[in-house]
Amino acid sequence: MDVKKLLADVTALPGVSGHEAQVSAYFAEQFRPLVDEVTVDAMYSVIAHKKGNGPKIMLCAHLDEIALMVTHIEDDGSLRLGNVGGVDPRILPASRVW
């Protein structure tokens, strides 16, 4: 598995909190050749099951990303933003937004 490619692929997908479907689908496809069964639930959690008697493991991680949402456009073109997810306001000054 090419970890560099995996990271590049997954970070290019939109995955804002509440809209993780594409990220979930990507990971489901990555797991599919390695396990016996893959399901994605209503909350976009990916559950992969490999049959056998070996030790059980669980990988638990967030699939969503934090984001900013435009809540208002001022007359001068400047934007008012609201956060989606856990944006720490201390990191916002001098942060590039695109």
Give the positions of each predicted feature.
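N-terminal hydrophobic/helix-forming segments and targeting peptides
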Residues: 1-98
